[in-house]
């Protein structure tokens, strides 16, 4: 789901083109790996607050944040394997501290992808690969 954030640099006139591209990538990638359920790419742009509200029913809510130095996926203490996970990955400039605090109010946990700051295009791939290696298809 594309989000409007304080540091987002995507031009609004490009959003439709990007969403169509992401949908095509999701479909082609699913076919390639034999995945039956194609990941959903939302049509419109949501605010962070709306995304957080819409994630209430998820078993686990994560924000991958470059400033989180101590907490990684392997450090999470879970009672059971999650069946559904809401994932937030920041824009090119990262999330602001105020945005991180807002996500925490909605029950999101901050986790690190490691010591390197990843490109906005790369971070989702790394995050999803790590989640899948821990818990399989979600």
Feature annotation, model-predicted:
Residues 1-62:
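RNA substrate-binding interface of SAM-dependent RNA methyltransferases
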Residues 32, 88-92, 110-112:
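Short glycine/serine/threonine-biased micro-segments
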Residues 39-40, 59-63, 83-87, 109:
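Structural motif
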Residues 44-45, 64-67, 91-92:
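Fold-independent oxyanion-binding glycine-rich loops
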Residues 67-81:
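Strongly charged, low-complexity linkers/loops
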Residues 68, 92-93, 115-118:
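Short, acidic/turn-prone active-site loops that include or flank metal/cofactor-
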Residues 82-102:
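A C-terminal functional module that forms or caps the active site or interfaces directly
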Residues 97-138:
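Structured adenosyl-cofactor binding patch, chiefly the S-adenosyl-L-methionine
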């Amino acid at each position: 789901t594309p989000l409007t954030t304080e540091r987002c640099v995507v031009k609004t006139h490009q959003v439709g083109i990007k969403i169509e591209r992401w949908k095509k990538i999701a479909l082609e990638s699913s076919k390639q790996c034999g995945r039956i359920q194609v990941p959903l790419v939302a049509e419109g742009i949501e605010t962070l607050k709306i995304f957080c509200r819409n994630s209430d029913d998820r078993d686990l809510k994560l924000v991958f944040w470059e400033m989180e130095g101590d907490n990684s996926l392997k450090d999470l203490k879970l009672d059971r394997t999650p069946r559904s996970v809401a994932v937030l990955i920041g824009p090119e400039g990262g999330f602001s501290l105020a945005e991180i605090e807002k996500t925490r109010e909605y029950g999101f946990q901050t986790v690190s992808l490691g010591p390197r700051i990843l490109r906005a295009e790369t971070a989702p791939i790394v995050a999803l690969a790590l989640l899948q290696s821990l818990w399989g298809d979600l």
